[in-house]
Amino acid sequence: MRFRRHAVALIFFLVLSILATYWPLFHAATHTGGYWTTDYYHFHWNFWWVRHALTTPGLNVYETNFVLFPATTNLAYHTLTLFWYPLWALLEPLVGTLVAMNVIFITAMTLTGYTAWLLLRREKVLDGLALAGASAYMLTPAMLLSVMLTNINYLSMFWLPVQILLWGQIAQNISQSKKALIWAIIQGCALYAMMMTDYTFLLFSAFLLIPYALLTLIEARAWSDRARLVAFGVLALVLMVVLLWFAGPLPHILTFDRSSLSPQPLKDAQGIPFPDGYFSRFATYDRKVTLGWFVLPVTLLTLIASLTVLRRRVRNSRRWFWLALVIVPLILSPGGSILIAGSEITMPFTAMFNLLNGMFRVPSRFGGLLILPAMIFVGRTWGVILMRSRELKIATSTLMILAVLVEAQLFAPMPIQPVTQPYDFYAKMGQEHGEPYDDYAVLEVPVAGGSGEAWVGEFRPMETQFYGMTHGKRMLNGSLARAPLVNFWYWLYDDPMLAWLGQRRYLEPENVESQLRERIFAWPIGYIVIHQDTIGRVGPTNQEIVGYFNTLPDLLCPVFVEGDAVVYRTAWHPDGCPDRIPPEIEPGTYQIDIGSIGDENFIGWGWHGPENIAGISVRWSGEYPQTQTYFDLPPGGYEISISAQAFHEPRTLRVLVNDSPLDEAVTVSTESLQTFTFTLPAEIVGDGKHLKLTLDYDGWVVPNDVNQSGDMRKLALMVDWIRFKDHP
């Protein structure tokens, strides 16, 4: 009977977890939560990194330069959540990292509900009320938001009831030293595992576990029992510390330079909105953490009833202990201040924030902490009344469970989004193993990184950290919690190359080229990946970066164009650069299909983004006074043909190759695409390497200026293709 009861409870919370996350579960293999960039990428990367560090000689789990390269970051305060790594490591090879993470979500939520139910039952709360209270604890907005954000550290709220349950076992068996010793050892291991999930659980557990431990000391029958309780408590703490030293982050915590941190200001600490957030649930997936309309109203109703109609009918003094534990988390949960009648009132969290030097910055998480004691208070109060009538007990328990489920809005689908687009070229990078391939870094563009306290650039480019699991190389982009500001802040404006590649500083060609020449070989950099979709194809920035890189053929060469990504291999790379010869469309004829996928291999400055006009892929020129194209050809002479059309008024066009003019200038009309032919002598082609073709036109027109559209671009010539035909 006892086993069946536990099995039913466990299945109940498992089903509830699945219902609460049904929408992401339906898309578990392809999507993650949210409709804006969340933290999913670095939680997945964390587990890849742990496996990589454990299986690669010379690496340390708690130190890395694989993100925010070239700096080495102490990961002692990073959210590694190592407790969950074994489950991920078991599942990831079988089902992939996305599905494995969803299994962690379900496991964490189920354990949270089940352990809360165990605690309520041990505190003599009726089964039905315990199910309702534990469900309220499991289905808080903070828990569901944690699923959406992949914050598996915040999701592991089962540690709070687990620690109380374990201490209760020590107290219950205190007269049997061997049993108590075993439970103390288990508690020490549990404290260690809790710390390997998230350090803040030690802070949270102190608000519940210390008062509960004091209660058991008071309730102990003899001073010898109290002495043993203290001894076993010390033993558990010592065991935790020993394990953290030899198999955890403690040595790295002690060497961590806290002066390098950049904590957020108090005003940014996310508290529960006062007063609405204590009596309603709203904007959960917009990062608003609330208590909802069940927990606090039911607790207040129970308190009022206890002081009035139930004052003489319920004589259970222990329930007041649990109610008292609600007070401190409740006061801390709104954050640094609240607004009452237009007056700002400073709250106690301000002192706590300052005491911890801003290390704890999410006071709204105290909301989950107060639910456990609140539900025990409610359950112990009403249980005395309900146990007298089986029908009333069933009806009340059912209504409370239904109220929790309705309040949790289970059937509202959680926002989801596809994970960052997969690319085959990252897998090819990942196949490059051994010396010297293991040494290079991948530079993602736009450049962006952060620490959870400060950021350089937008969040979306940081998502490229997810690709690190595929290519397995060092990279700049990404996020490491509480990384020193010095590791990445210079990317903002101070560094000409990285600030320009992050779209925060204008291009300074000489400075950027100098830095590229030094860093490609010193860091070294193996590949530079330009994410055109993130930069934006509309506007000059994308063409500026691609065009500039194409002017440095001795340093960079395009090797992959896939989807919205253009990948440049550097001169350091052992595999070298392939020839930049356009596709041969027929024997002896090579064509650059302007506007088609892959033309990024050839285009320089002056081109606008690709377009499809009447089924033809084209680009407009005109952004610069001249427009360049870069390519290689087999040695020899060629006839160059260009398909072009002018915008708004005829244009005079001259063509140059390697700055040498070809033939006479031609006039390009506005009527339709026309073909213009030029002769390219063999002596200009030379060995065929690093050729530059320039379109030199006599002006441009902005469509908006001539009332043709709202287009603000400078348009000169529309080009469909450029062909090179053998011409002896």
Regions found by a protein language model. Give the residues of each.
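Hydrophobic, aromatic-rich transmembrane alpha-helices
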Residues: 294-320, 324-333, 383-384
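Membrane-embedded helix bundles of polyisoprenyl
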Residues: 13-16, 104-123, 128-218, 232, ...
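Membrane-interface coil-to-helix junctions
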Residues: 16-112, 140-145, 151-157, 271-275, ...
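Extracytoplasmic
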Residues: 402-589
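Periplasmic/ER-lumenal interhelical loops and adjacent helix-loop junctions
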Residues: 34-53, 232-309, 361-368
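Signature aromatic-anchored transmembrane alpha helix within multi-pass, membrane-resident enzymes
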Residues: 210, 233-238, 376, 380-409
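Start-transfer (signal-anchor) and selected internal transmembrane alpha helices
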Residues: 1-24, 233-234, 314-325, 395-397
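Membrane-helix boundary/interfacial segments in multi-pass membrane proteins
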Residues: 33-36, 146-154, 264-267, 272, ...
